[in-house]
Amino acid sequence: LELETAGMLKQTKGQLGRRQQVKPEDQLYKAVSPGGWQLYWGKNSRTNDYVSRNMTGPQDLWFHAKGMPGSHLVLKCGDSADKVSEEDLHYAAAFAAGYSKGKDDGKVEVIVAQGRDVKKPKGARPGLVTVDSYYTVMVAPRRLED
């Protein structure tokens, strides 16, 4: 190994071009709503898949910009969804809008669903889900300050 790093031996095939695999949970955006609820959303289709399949519980609230590509966002509330204020709902929806194709629009329609209504079809590509039951809210897009 020392000879390989010194350049005296040729690298083995398994070591050539090997990149460190980035875990989806390391690529999430995170925020806290005004009411103290944790928000998580994906940066790409792989992390969207992780958010929708691994982080969203049956009672959590799930958000996505309607009719356009965008991040899947979860508001972690467990069985306390009825305690989430309108302000917190709109705050989360604004991030879902801000991390979608509609980020530069004045207002974006955002889907709000319970986690149990979000399903991944068998064999579907990463980031693709179906939503059985939802309602929508209109919000102005918001992004984290970079």
Question: How does the language model describe each region?
Answer:
Residues 29-41, 47-146:
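Phosphate-backbone binding interfaces of nucleic-acid-interacting proteins
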Residues 1-38:
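Coiled-coil termination/hinge junctions
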